[in-house]
Design a protein with these regions (language model features):
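Short turn/helix-capping motifs enriched in Asx and small/polar residues
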Residues: 1-76
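Catalytic toxin/effector domains delivered as secreted proteins or via bacterial secretion systems
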Residues: 37-38, 45-48, 75, 80, ...
Length: 248
């Protein structure tokens, strides 16, 4: 690779041009997280560990958004890239820290700003106009393992409820979670560990369309007036990765 890593500051004793510490067999990703590009240098998305860290390059056909980190490594293309492809990736990669989702968490204002700066993104979704959100950083409020009859099964849940709404006052992380997700499918992974995954789909789109009850519709209408949101224009795809943990 001929492009230095923007994370070079994290390893001051290592050359910024030393891809995988010069040992891609044993150290495919020193930071443990990474964006993914195809062999033509196009951004594809992320594995289950997010945007940060050194990038992978793989054939587009082997990529699935949110795929496991191990699986992504198994599909990675080893060896040097053509200079023009490496440059293309390097330019895009260097700009990733400027994205609001680079840290894995998106505030309400960041979501609104992204929607306004990317009109019609939901109608024309691309890896670049989507946001990538880490489930580990979400607060699911009063949702508990008792809301899931089985593990490993997509289960519809309603995060926008009275107890969570009250609990979100003074808790911006919970407020951002219920604002973004509302009614959504989730999966309980381990009952003892209280681990869950957000099931990506139409319900995880970051939008302001009405539906799902009079209270929700009233809140959305008020929100759209306050923030000048046009639901026909504003909205984007949100891809949730990683594993979240319930409070109980």
């Amino acid at each position: 690779f001929v492009v230095s890593t923007t994370m070079a500051f994290a390893w001051p004793g290592i050359s910024p041009y030393a891809y995988c510490l010069n040992n891609p067999i044993k150290v495919i990703d020193p930071d443990g997280r990474n964006p993914i590009y195809d062999a033509d240098g196009n951004f594809l998305g992320t594995d289950d560990l997010g945007l940060q860290g050194n990038y992978y390059v793989m054939d587009k056909g082997g990529f699935t958004q949110g795929m496991s980190h191990l699986e992504a490594g198994n599909h990675a293309i080893m060896g040097d890239l053509p200079a023009e492809i490496a440059k293309k990736i390097g330019i895009h990669y260097a700009d990733l820290p400027n994205r609001p989702d680079y840290d894995g968490f998106v505030t309400i204002q960041e979501g609104i700003d992204w929607a306004k700066s990317h009109p019609y993104a939901l109608q024309n979704p691309t890896p670049d106009n989507a946001l990538y959100i880490d489930a580990a950083q979400l607060d699911f409020g009063h949702l508990s393992t008792s809301n899931f009859a089985e593990t490993g099964i997509a289960t519809p849940v309603n995060l926008f409820n009275v107890s969570n709404t009250i609990g979100s006052l003074g808790n911006p992380r919970l407020m951002a979670t219920i604002y973004a997700l509302g009614r959504v499918d989730m999966m309980l992974l381990n009952r003892e560990q209280r681990t869950v995954r957000v099931v990506n789909g139409n319900a995880t789109a970051y939008d302001w369309n009405q539906g799902g009850g009079a209270v929700r519709n009233s809140c959305i209408m008020l929100n759209n007036v306050i923030f000048n949101i046009n639901p026909k224009v504003h909205g984007f795809r949100a891809n949730y990765y990683g594993v979240g943990v319930l409070r109980k």
